[in-house]
Design a protein with these regions (language model features):
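Conserved small/polar residues in nucleotide/adenosyl-binding loops
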Residues: 212-219
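Short, solvent-exposed recognition segments
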Residues: 97-174
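N-terminal helix-turn-helix
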Residues: 1-57
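Extended hydrophobic
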Residues: 147-211
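Solvent-exposed beta-strand sheet faces enriched in polar/charged residues
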Residues: 31, 38-40, 78, 88, ...
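All-alpha effector-binding/dimerization core of bacterial HTH-type transcriptional repressors
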Residues: 48-96, 121-124, 133
Length: 219
């Protein structure tokens, strides 16, 4: 309860009423032994409702599945969520961990190939706004490696390169030994709405090879 009070800024009475209501609705459940709270199963229903309501996800699912079969590598579709990408569709390889199979995880735009492919399709003023606000984000729980790019000038250069190439890359920035290549999905106004990303091991792939294979799958 104290943690919820700290996060919400509400007093104890308000927090207790709020948690009681969420438990009654099924969005919160009591933790093991009746201690604390965990997300409730009802959240899964809302996730289902959302996924079913987005036509892009339905149309993209066969493509994502085909790309994964052709490359035998992880393929993901992520949506934009302000300063983050949030994984919506994920097709895995047998070597992936459980957490990497789950939709809903979010990562910063500035630190991912998918995010930078989105930024590459935005005007410069919007890119600068993303860079400025991202610099203020807490990064304590964000996956990173010694190779993660955090310098705004370097990120800006990577975005400009992605504009020229039509795709963005990230080498070992979220996970050592992993290479990511991504391209943005644009709407009818040529605004980015999502990104498709393919990930391979640096020991097995280089960027041109991964691009060739993903292009072949797309065809």
């Amino acid at each position: 309860m104290n943690e919820l009070m700290e996060i919400t800024g509400f007093d104890r009475s308000t927090t207790q009423r709020m948690t009681h209501t969420l438990v009654q609705l099924g969005y919160l459940e009591r933790g093991p032994g009746g201690k604390g709270y965990t997300p409730g199963k009802k959240i899964l229903q809302r996730s289902f409702d959302y996924m079913r309501s987005v036509p892009l996800l339905e149309r993209a699912t066969p493509l994502i599945a085909e790309m994964q079969r052709e490359t035998n590598e992880r393929v993901e579709l992520s949506l934009i969520s302000d300063l983050y990408i949030i994984f919506a569709l994920r097709r895995q390889t047998k070597r992936q961990t459980f957490s990497s199979t789950l939709a809903g995880r979010e990562l910063p735009l500035v630190q991912t190939a998918g995010g930078r492919s989105i930024m590459a399709n935005l005007p410069d003023d919007e890119v600068e706004d993303i860079l400025a606000r991202s610099a203020l984000m807490p990064m304590d729980n964000i996956p990173s490696t010694p190779k993660t790019n955090n310098d705004p000038d370097r990120i800006r250069a990577l975005v400009h390169r992605a504009r020229e190439d039509g795709y963005a890359t990230a080498v070992e920035e979220s996970l050592l030994g992993e290479l990511n290549v991504a391209t943005a999905i644009l709407d009818n106004r040529h605004r980015p709405v999502a990104t498709i990303q393919i990930a391979g091991l640096t020991s097995e792939w280089d960027t041109p090879c991964l691009l060739y294979t993903s292009d072949a799958a797309d065809e």
